[in-house]
A protein has these predicted regions:
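Multi-pass membrane proteins that catalyze or facilitate reactions on polyprenyl-/lipid-phosphate substrates
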Residues: 1-48, 59-284
Length: 284
């Protein structure tokens, strides 16, 4: 836990930087696990929705202490960023005009962070013609056609992103022409109870979030949905949250949760604070 706490206070730069810190502290210095084990955990977590670096750290905790240590690892990992962002959000809420004045230069910096993150993700993930085609399609639909689609088919909703993701996933599945490496099957006891619980909560949260006007219920549904459908790290989460919290008006509300300026302040601050980018949820 001490090592995780130390890493949490020096974890700038996103998942790849976090992985380098894990390698240095947990593998090379403490020798808790090997480089091969670390990369296996990270590769597996890359295929799962949610924050890959956080899930990797939780997997290491689970290896040594089961569910309890995995949960405590998560708590220690996100606590510093959570506390700092929560205090900042309270400060902005209490001193609205003055706080926004102090943070007026954070917004353009935050836009720069988002652009750089987008360029890095394109360089890392788009490597062939099909990839460029899918990236272009996603950009056109979510950025250029958002308002025309809103007029025609009511597509200006948070569900635009999962629809694009599912479409791209199906295209990639049917277009795959590579070879699958042989593997030695192993017998495991699959935790069906956990999977069923996860699906039931997802469905109930979606239904309650649609019919309820309670902001806490709606916020829970939003964050649970984000964690379920986000692949690729915290930077992918930012445009989804921007659409949900600044453009979408929830049931019983007269305006969005926050303004674009307030959200960009949060984006800039989370980049300046150690820890996972997903902790921006505490700011919102």
């Amino acid at each position: 836990m001490k090592d995780v706490f130390i890493i949490a206070f020096s974890a700038y730069g996103g998942p790849n930087m976090h992985l380098a810190l894990y390698q240095k502290r947990l593998v090379e210095e403490k020798k808790y696990l090997t480089t091969e084990q670390l990369m296996e955990y990270f590769s597996l977590c890359q295929m799962l929705p949610g924050p890959s670096s956080t899930q990797t750290l939780m997997s290491i905790g689970y290896q040594f202490g089961g569910r309890v240590l995995a949960f405590l690892t998560l708590l220690v990992w996100v606590l510093p960023a959570f506390i700092l962002l929560t205090i900042t959000a309270i400060f902005i809420g209490a001193f609205q005009d003055q706080a926004l004045g102090y943070l007026r230069f954070v917004q353009p910096v935050a836009v720069g962070f988002v652009i750089v993150a987008g360029v890095k993700m394109v360089k890392k993930s788009v490597k062939n013609r099909q990839g460029y085609l899918l990236a272009t399609m996603a950009f056109v639909v979510t950025a250029l056609l958002r308002y025309p689609l809103d007029t025609w088919v009511n597509m200006k909703t948070p569900w635009m992103f999962p629809i694009v993701l599912v479409t791209a996933g199906l295209f990639s599945f049917f277009d795959f022409k590579g070879t699958v490496q042989k593997y030695k099957p192993i017998k495991i006891k699959f935790p069906w109870r956990s999977l069923v619980t996860f699906v039931v909560i997802f469905i109930l949260a979606g239904v309650l979030g649609k019919v309820s006007s309670n902001p806490l219920v709606i916020l829970f549904e939003n964050c649970y949905r984000f964690g379920t459908i986000v692949f690729g790290g915290g930077n992918v989460l930012i445009p989804m949250m921007l659409e949900q919290f600044t453009n979408h008006i929830s049931n019983g509300a007269s305006e969005p949760f926050m303004t674009t300026g307030e959200f960009l302040n949060g984006v800039g601050l989370v980049q300046a604070i150690p820890g996972p980018i997903f902790t921006i949820a505490s700011f919102t």
